Design a protein with these regions (language model features):
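Positively charged n-region of N-terminal signal peptides that target proteins for export
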Residues: 1-5
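Cleavable N-terminal signal peptides of Sec/SRP-targeted secreted and luminal proteins
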Residues: 8-10
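Tandem repeat scaffolds
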Residues: 19-175
Length: 175
């Protein structure tokens, strides 16, 4: 009887977090909004699954993608300025010409992704997996790559000014 009552109570309840917010519903609504409008600025999208998603030219500034999976996604020319992608999986994705100005990419997995021409000014890429990543002509001014894995990364023509690299500050592109 006790198990039956517990099941009834759980089936009629809604999952909420400690602050009382119904974040699971918000995430579903935000995914619908993103799919409909290709825009979801400041949206909560934590732990969401966007594997293989086409988010070409999407407006996602300030979005919360913490621990989301964006592997093999197309984010060409997407605006992710000020977004939080802490711990996200973005391996094998296309972020060519994406705007990631001031974004939090701490401990993100970008293995094999294309960030050619991306704006990573003031981005936090510390402890990120950037192995095999194409960063050609990317702007890394004031970016933090301390502790990042750059094994096999392509940095041809990348703009490095006051860039905190794993080996220290790189000012090779400053004028």
């Amino acid at each position: 009887m006790k198990i039956f009552l517990t099941l009834i109570l759980l089936s009629s309840s809604t999952l909420t977090f400690a602050d009382g917010n119904n974040d699971w519903q918000n995430i579903d609504d935000n995914i619908f909004k993103l799919n409909s409008l290709n825009s979801c600025q400041g949206c909560l999208l934590r732990n969401a699954n966007f594997i293989g998603a086409d988010l070409n030219n999407a407006l996602l500034s300030g979005a919360d993608f913490i621990s989301a999976n964006l592997s093999n996604s197309n984010l060409y020319n997407a605006n992710l300025e000020g977004s939080s992608l802490f711990g996200a999986e973005i391996n094998g994705s296309n972020l060519e010409n994406a705007n990631l100005f001031g974004s939090n990419l701490f401990a993100v997995n970008l293995y094999g992704s294309n960030l050619a021409g991306a704006n990573l000014t003031e981005a936090d890429l510390s402890h990120a997996n950037l192995s095999g990543v194409n960063l050609a002509k990317a702007n890394l001014t004031n970016a933090n790559l301390r502790g990042a894995d750059l094994d096999g990364a392509i940095l041809d023509g990348a703009f490095l000014c006051n860039t905190m690299m794993p080996w220290g500050v790189d000012n090779s592109s400053c004028q």
